[in-house]
Amino acid sequence: MKPKDLKSPFKWEHRQIVIQDRVWYVPDQHLSDIPFIFPGWTHDQTFAQDKPIYLEYCSGNGAWIASKAIEQSQYNWVGIEKKFDRTRKIWSKIKKFELDNLLTICGEGFHVTRDFFANESVDAVFINFPDPWPKKRHAKHRIVQPAFVKEIHRILKSDKLFTLVTDDAAYSKIMIDVIYQTGGFISLFEAPYYTTSYPGYGSSYFEELWREKGKSIHYHVFRKI
């Protein structure tokens, strides 16, 4: 099925939180009179099978997470992407490859995490090529903020890994600083706390794009302590 085949289950003036056809919609407001109750990860609406949850933020068009769901079917994969046009592309891949171990969430990462993920419920977290918002006046829009890192620490199981990937050297340093200042994590790499070679990690649209432009990719891996 093509991305355009996915239609929103509600009109904007009647937006609501709903899980439908491998997509979990989390708009900025829930305007239904019926409260949303998350059914759990083993419900038919989500995964049915009880497997470790691997969570990706900034999923983009879904190339990375779809390939991971195919290669590593022993995990349940969740991709969070706030833009509906990109969510459609992830959904299209779910349908094309019949991925019953991949669910996409269309919503804002921090609020979705805070409102719907239980303590120590996730086995791995990935953030691939988040928008660096390089201008100082836009810094508040960056996903890697102290409050967000605290939420990742809360939902991640003990000793599990938090991986971040960027092509932006300045943002790499910012993310490292935020994580260490927030606390609760330790890098798997010695200073400068990243590697530019991480075989087997997988590729995405942005990774291929920036490599073609000659950019170096920074991989950061932190363990929850």
From Swiss-Prot:
Keywords: Methyltransferase, S-adenosyl-L-methionine, Transferase, tRNA processing. InterPro entries: SAM-dependent_MTases_sf, tRNA_(Gua-N-7)_MeTrfase_Trmb, tRNA_methyltr_TrmB_bact. Substrate binds at residues 135, 167. The active site is at 131. SUPFAM superfamilies: S-adenosyl-L-methionine-dependent methyltransferases. Catalyzes the formation of N(7)-methylguanine at position 46 (m7G46) in tRNA. It holds the Pfam family Methyltransf_4. Pathway: tRNA modification; N(7)-methylguanine-tRNA biosynthesis. PANTHER family: 3-DEOXY-D-MANNO-OCTULOSONIC-ACID TRANSFERASE/TRNA GUANINE-N 7 - -METHYLTRANSFERASE (PTHR23417), PENTACOTRIPEPTIDE-REPEAT REGION OF PRORP DOMAIN-CONTAINING PROTEIN (PTHR23417:SF14). Signal peptide: none annotated. Belongs to the class I-like SAM-binding methyltransferase superfamily. TrmB family. GO terms for molecular function: tRNA (guanine(46)-N7)-methyltransferase activity. This is tRNA (guanine-N(7)-)-methyltransferase. It catalyses: guanosine(46) in tRNA + S-adenosyl-L-methionine = N(7)-methylguanosine(46) in tRNA + S-adenosyl-L-homocysteine. Its EC number is 2.1.1.33. It comes from the Bacteria.
